Amino acid sequence: QRSFRDRIIVVKFSAEWCGPCKKIKPLWNEWISIVSSNIVIVDIDIDESIDLYVQLKAKKMVKGVPTILAFYGDIMRDQWYIPDDSVSGGNEGDVKNFMNRCLIKAKTLIQ
């Protein structure tokens, strides 16, 4: 059983009605089909988890939707809820760059 230390947790906040979410959905679906086994994907529809979304937005962790957060298991911190990387909005270039950073980091964790 692997520990969290060699994993990345990626959490995406989106909504069915969100235009930018729809724009990046094909890119997201393609990416999650090729991610390494040490990347754990959590996909949250804010309409189904509004309390969590409101709480994270109040902490300025989520600016809006879509927002994707990455938590690296090899970084020790007191405030575990602060992401190590993130991207917000529907800019496909920004989302691709975020995804590439996650893939690169994931490879370093299993070497």
Predicted regions and their residues:
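Non-catalytic, surface beta->alpha helical segment in thiol-disulfide oxidoreductase systems
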Residues: K63-Q111
